[in-house]
Amino acid sequence: MSSRALFVIFLAMTAAPVIAQNMVIESLDGPVTQTEINAFKAHIQTVNAPEGNGNVWVFGNGGKSIEACGLMYEVSHDRAILDRMIYYCDEMLSRRNDLWPAEKGGQRIVWAGKIEPVWPSSNPDVKPAGAGVEQGDEIAHMNYCAKLILQNPSLWNEKVTIGDAYNFGDTYKARALRYIKEGDYVIDNWILPHFIRSSEGNHYYFPGAPNTYKANEPAPWNQAWMLTNALVRLVECHLLLNDDHKRITSYDAIIQPNINWFISSLRPSTSAKGTLCYTWAYALPRGMEDTNHAAYDSEGLWIAYESGRYKLTFNDLVPFANTYCDVVMGTITNGKFAGRVDGSTGVGHAGGDNFVRDEYIYLAEFRPDMFEDMAKAEISTGKVAVSVPITARLLWEKDRRYKKRAAK
């Protein structure tokens, strides 16, 4: 069934357009329309930065809003969308523990024994505060914005339209440079001293005491990818600037071994459709990855692949797409897709979903035949009506598909 026919049926059932409050997807094929762009732009103006300075900026609404704006800026090059992305990044950076005033919840002592440049992952009442390699995700979000600015030199000397409330830099380039500087600062002062085990090929490990979270264990893969995302995007920014080649080399020497480590942990399998798939652990040495956390593995694979730098080919990522499309989506239990990458379902994070988590939409790049099925899952569960990242990713993938067809 064509995507336009799908939407005709859906619209007939609802007697209304597919709306995420103010957001609209008019069809799943053709170019992204100005109506779709305007609706997204209007909607995000009503979505304020979330309260707090913790994981809400990792995998919560704050971090996801940044990524969504970036994708829609790639589609539209609409400066108002970039400005909203900058707004979220500014709010996030301003709330970093060492920058945020104590009376607002900052200046917390972290498990390492002092105030650290992190966004604490523990609740505000936990002492000492927790933080780990997931800090990479905030850096990745912020430097996605920096990358988009650096890719558009016509913006560099223009004043940022929304102003500079936190003195991060009044022009677009100055703002990008500040984001890069602060990202490198967190890597230098938090990540490198604690989480890179040089004696084991620069792999990501949690330290021992006084850290109590997974002490001396490998980082779970979803968290590992969050850190890899940060390093990849910082490398991309430094390449665009053609600066700090020593740092690029040092980051590459961390990124590639950790990607290789992940790839070496994969266990090949075959789906009921006969496609090559993989299973892997949530964290080494054993176990089975759940589909909540595997979403971040998928996002990380895409970010590294898109950079074109880390020996990941199109064919390397097809089995991950097969795993999600043929095993996870192909196994329905009590109305939900499988909760683990082997097709089984458990509870909690392994309980499964009746929708497609937004990060998995990247995998439609490698299984274009499944894009409409993914979109139908979002539509039928009402996710398009409420999810900024899902709507943005669907429109972004729609745009890529249209441009590929137009280029043929």
Placement of each model-derived feature along the sequence:
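Bacterial N-terminal signal peptides that target proteins for export
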Residues: 1-7
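Cleavable N-terminal signal peptides
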Residues: 7-8, 18
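Terminal, non-catalytic domain-edge segments
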Residues: 21-53, 142-186, 233, 237, ...
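N-terminal substrate-binding region of glycoside hydrolase catalytic domains
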Residues: 23-82, 89, 93-100
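Solvent-exposed loop and edge beta-strand segments that line ligand/cofactor-binding
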Residues: 43-63, 70, 74, 117-136, ...
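Extended ligand-binding groove/face enriched in aromatic
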Residues: 54, 75-230, 353-362
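Long, repeat-rich segments with strong aromatic
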Residues: 248-332
